[in-house]
Amino acid sequence: MNRYVSLLKSWCDGLIEYQIKELADSTLNGAFVCPACKNTHGRCDNAMFPMMYMFNETQDEKYRTCAFGVFDWQKNVLLRDYSVYNDGNNEWRGITVFSAIGYLKTLINFKEQLGNRAAEVEKRCKSMCEWLLKNLTVNFVCNINYIAANSGAMALAWQYFGNEKYRKISEDLLNYCLEFITENGLLFGEMFPRNSVSRRGCTAVDIGYNVEESVPALLDAALILGDEEKIAKVQKLLTAQLDFMLPDGAWDNSFGCRNYKWTYWGSRTSDGAAAAYYRMKDRDPQFETAALRNIDLLERCTHDGLLYGGPDYYKWGERACVHHTFCHALGLADALVLGIKPKDNGGELPLDKPCCSIKYYPEIATYRINSGDLIADITAYDFGENSFVAGRGHATGGTMSLLFSRKYGVVAAASLSFYRTAEPLNQQLTLNLEQHAPLTFRIECSDESGIYTSALDTTAELTARKNESVITVTAQGTLTNLEGRKKTGAEYILKYTFESDCVTIDAELASADKGCVFIAPLIGDAAKITTASRDKTREIFNLVPGFIATEHSMCFENGKLSFKLSFQK
């Protein structure tokens, strides 16, 4: 049993430990109790496919029993029209598409192993596909991930059931989604209306959802339909996304419009990127490398049979949400069906090699910096600013949302500016509120009217220049609160100077008072701050993207502050 099969086995075994089995009301048996969310998640039927994979692999009946258990429990959220509620108290039904995908992949690969229950699974699956055919069209009020997912689902339905109507809608949805590609080759539309444009001209881009859900589904559709032109377009999406895969296998979603679900390895409720990349390995060898590195990161974030929501969750004492495990178990099973295996020596990815470069992404108002061993993002992304107060407050304002060292790993990774559950049933809460703090680099001022920060100014202006081996990015803005109100007389300038092995940050703040500080949370122990300012430190953690950090809080003097980040082990 190779290491990846063992990983899937550990996930399946972990899920079985949390499966409800012996309630007197047998209709409630079969779901997984979530140790993080203290409830059951309505999409637990997504575990059927990986459980059937493990049954086929081991012939251990416990996996098939678990698969039938989640299938039976789904009746608790299954409507008479065969659409599915997201949860027992959440009326969203778009997730019907993920149930259909899981059942179709089970039927295509393991119908015989379902035994005398195959017909029941097939009947429910076909009824779901009929609902999706009629309802989950381009007119459905949803983000593009659902349209993309249904393109893949309908292609699978055509492959299994053979009905041309499924092929036709899959093709239509695929064509529609492939119109939502930015000038830099990224899929957009991860907000509704899908073609929305911000004041700055940005579109709705979320790397986590793109790489783990939308683009894999589009690839399924293109390959099943056998459309070489569309396959080539999806391949370009896969290639463009690799500019956001960090050398350790993580996905950089530090700026994403849905980064409230960023887990460093991906996103909280999607299936994963490995199968899509591995499926295309013969067309581009770096795709296999991407798949392997991401699975290796998932393995490092797995403890006691569950996938944790970030690299430091387990160490900090946070519980694992089972949603991560049953979704990514489906994705890993998909990759294993294709034959994926670990390799000791993989190839290279775009961000592996040290270089000196700067690239601007206007669709996300973000500069990507490569400076020697350092990778950084400086962002002024303003998409979704009206929903910041609802818990979607990704970094903006000229924030350095990511700093990664090719030698030492992640150094800075922006969280939400204020953690609020935008999707209460898909996000967990911490029991350690005192130390749960933003991981975002920022100027911050507090007064009687609240907290104002540079990381929330969606109107900040960025400029950048490269002079031989030195890159400088400057941001100018005004401290802003969560509701979008600007603090009078609180204009700021942030200047980032990147050299091959260090970063210097100079900050200026008009009318800086005693309540104004620069906060720099550093992840790991490789980076060292040198400053003349008073520097107060404490240990913090944030659920997004799941890191422990040392928070440095530095005081302004005469409205100015400067510090240098250098590296040592």
Question: Which residues fall in each region the model found?
Answer:
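Long, well-ordered core segments of solenoidal/helical folds
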Residues: 3-31, 64-83, 120-140, 164-191, ...
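Surface-exposed beta-strand/loop patches in extracellular or lumenal glycoproteins
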Residues: 514-525
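A generic secondary-structure signal for well-formed alpha-helical elements
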Residues: 107, 158, 181, 241, ...
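Long, contiguous hydrophobic alpha-helical segments, chiefly transmembrane helices and signal peptides
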Residues: 67-70, 74, 94-95, 148-151, ...
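Short aromatic-acidic-glycine turn motif
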Residues: 525-535
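Beta-strand-rich recognition/accessory modules
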Residues: 537-569
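Aromatic-lined, polymer-binding surfaces characteristic
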Residues: 36-56, 60-230, 258-266
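Extended polysaccharide-engagement surfaces of secreted carbohydrate-active enzymes
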Residues: 228-231, 243-515
